[in-house]
Amino acid sequence: MATAANQIGRITQVIGAVVDVQFEGHLPAILNSLETKNAGNRLVLEVAQHLGESTVRTIAMDTTEGLVRGQEVTDTGAPIRVPVGEGTLGRIINVIGEPIDEAGPVKADSLRAIHQEAPSYTDQSTEAEILVTGIKVVDLLAPYAKGGKIGLFGGAGVGKTVLIQELINNVAKAHGGYSVFAGVGERTREGNDLYHEFIESKVNADPHNPDPSVKSKCALVFGQMNEPPGARARVALTGLTIAEDFRDKGQDVLFFVDNIFRFTQAGSEVSALLGRIPSAVGYQPTLATDMGALQERITTTTKGSITSVQAIYVPADDLTDPAPATSFAHLDATTTLSRSIAEKGIYPAVDPLDSTSRMLSPLVVGEEHYAVARQVQQVLQRYKALQDIIAILGMDELSEEDKLTVARARKVERFMSQPFHVAEIFTGSPGKFVELADTIKGFKGLVEGKYDHLPEAAFYMVGTIEEAVEKGKKLAAEAA
């Protein structure tokens, strides 16, 4: 066992984010956290390799400028530990659990190591259950599994962040669950904007001047683009550790990762720094193992669930690139946001034909839901096929049957839009949470032609089908 004296080592070499530390007689275990001071600040190093009998190679969690050879380093005897519990809600912490929102220390229930084993088979729940999000297009066509993993694809400016905010808001309201947002290697400006948007849209309370009527629903963990690769490779684990603690206390937790590609990218940088031989396209040889170690911890246990929504950047739009291809293997559902739908003013801009889910099976969602979803996709697919003809020859050249299909498809498309709670402050229209039964009923009536008499505009930005009928009456009265 290590005594206090031999828990102290000395730095022998610093190469960028890699620091070698020599210990006499006792070597810290792999993944142990070592601490030193750099310009008065705490610097955490994580043991990655043992070199020879007395030296460990570590990855720094912050910048290493200013470190000198011979400097003392202390072995903490445990992996990196971060604060967990309700004290983290509404706060921003970094990879090592320090608050970075200038609102004082985090009031944590306890500390928990960021490296944990995935739950054993006996602890996992095997029931296939749907997480109702209250967002019509998602619940109908690509339903999320409780404890599942969802990939969120979308370019810049199509509404990824607003969709994420609405999911956080709805899960908190409908399921009483908390959320954890891990910003992995993305822009610091976006992280800052997100933090302030969460406060404005009442997802979180402002820690600087708290409003007693607002309860924070989301913890934020950031390791942004400017951080060294060590921090970016570990920040997703820090966020996951906070989520696991909520889950073990019986919560249904939402865990957001933006962006899962940056986790792989940081892993590849660390791997190169450690001198490992790269594999395909320059990625780390342990790519699948690293991804598996993270993803296998995201699951439903007998106590609670972690449902994860992961934004996935696809480098050069190449879906066969090893990084996105490895993450696809773990996904239960994909939600694809489309620019062409956003251009029509239909929000959320979810592509109904490109979004998929493993849960959309009659055995899980039931015969009626499955049949309605497939009919909706059929109508939209037919409309898509007819668009070229409409563009060249116009609507008049279509058969009566096709005209009816187009009219219904356009109504279905508009009915997929809905006002969001988190966008109320911008749009002025109150947000809507639509129950699954109402969603199925509405779309079923639409594809069966029950609402053929209503104008298209009646279906735009409403919640349930009853609201669309009301809006239709109002529009008719105004026109009369």
Swiss-Prot record:
Catalytic activity field: ATP + H2O + 4 H(+)(in) = ADP + phosphate + 5 H(+)(out)
Alphabetical list of SUPFAM superfamilies matching this protein: C-terminal domain of alpha and beta subunits of F1 ATP synthase, N-terminal domain of alpha and beta subunits of F1 ATP synthase, P-loop containing nucleoside triphosphate hydrolases
Listed GO MF terms: ATP binding; ATP hydrolysis activity; proton-transporting ATP synthase activity, rotational mechanism
A cellular component term, taken from the record's GO annotations: proton-transporting ATP synthase complex
Membrane topology, as annotated: Peripheral membrane protein
Family (UniProt): Belongs to the ATPase alpha/beta chains family.
UniProt-recorded name of the protein: ATP synthase subunit beta 1
Protein species of origin: Bradyrhizobium sp. (strain BTAi1 / ATCC BAA-1182)
